[in-house]
């Protein structure tokens, strides 16, 4: 991998090609991360697990190492080749996903899921920083939103193919097949992307930004940036329910609507795909139009969207038919993912380019440790707790109570909108001076 010289990022690799390659890797990231949601149905039956055990396997097992290793790996990515780190991460998480298919017990599957988390820890934050070095600030929210399409596309494909393979073969084969399918993406990242200049679109003359500072300096910068913490905890609050839904809704459709795995894969996969793609793209598109002139808009977009998403999901839980449920859940999914482009773009902008990977990892640490680690567990634990009262409908009420986290997220983003403008221009001054 050749190192970048001087000049703009466009001198290294065309931005569109880079975005396409990283999007492919991110799709596999979420296929491997979320496939366990639909496979939880046959796994629960075969291994005789409770909802709480399923939530630990799907949440804590993944989140501990995924969140904990993200910051040191991102610190390394601010200094070394981000391309090499991303390629190695894709290969590692793909191999551990395949290893999930070899598990014969709860603890074996728990450990394999830990391995998936270790691999994915090095994929996202370096990718955010890499994308930001290929696109100027006025196009960055849309570019990051396009990259973030990997979330709904990967989640939908994981649900669809996971359900189809498990129905026609078994759940172990589903893990092995999708895991091995991701390995070529690692090679494509390695050979298809050339490392760009860091901060070439953010410095006054297009030259590289200053070398990455010590971690203590990054921490001090983040500590002095209130909007970073508000954006992070706003995302984390929304992700408590977001990750909980992607894991538990397949089981909800099985228990409350009596759908088969292939039906769940098609039904819920289409909700995630249509709603997620529309919401992610439109959120970034709107962010690029309102954000540069008024940075508060980057926080107001998710504030409004989460406020509306909560009642959409609540109505969908009690819809009288699958068709009405599909419409309500799709609208809710669209609104719930609109935050990705605007918020990620704002996080990239409020710190200098040489701090981006570490700042992104810190943001992801908060978001994922709370969202994945607590959200999946919360809904599973609540479902077990309410099981004696509601029976197979316990997940319906568990999700209903969890919708309060969307409203909490909206409130945090409204507060963030009052602080973001000052931090936005402070980050701009630091980037230019670098």
What are these regions (language model features)?
Residues 5-11, 198-232, 256:
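Juxtamembrane intracellular "pre-TM" segments in multi-pass secondary transporters
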Residues 36-37, 225-281, 336-340, 344, ...:
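Extracytoplasmic gate region of multi-pass secondary transporters
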Residues 39-68:
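Extracellular/periplasmic helix-loop-helix junction of adjacent transmembrane segments
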Residues 48, 81, 102-108, 136, ...:
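Helix-breaking motifs and short loop linkers at transmembrane-helix boundaries and internal kinks
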Residues 59-73, 270-283:
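Central cavity-lining transmembrane alpha-helices of secondary-active solute carriers
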Residues 68-104:
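Conserved MFS/SLC helix-loop-helix module at the cytosolic interface between two early adjacent transmembrane helices
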Residues 112-152:
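Cytoplasmic helix-loop-helix junction between adjacent transmembrane helices
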Residues 147-195:
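Helix-loop-helix hairpin linking two adjacent transmembrane segments in secondary transporters
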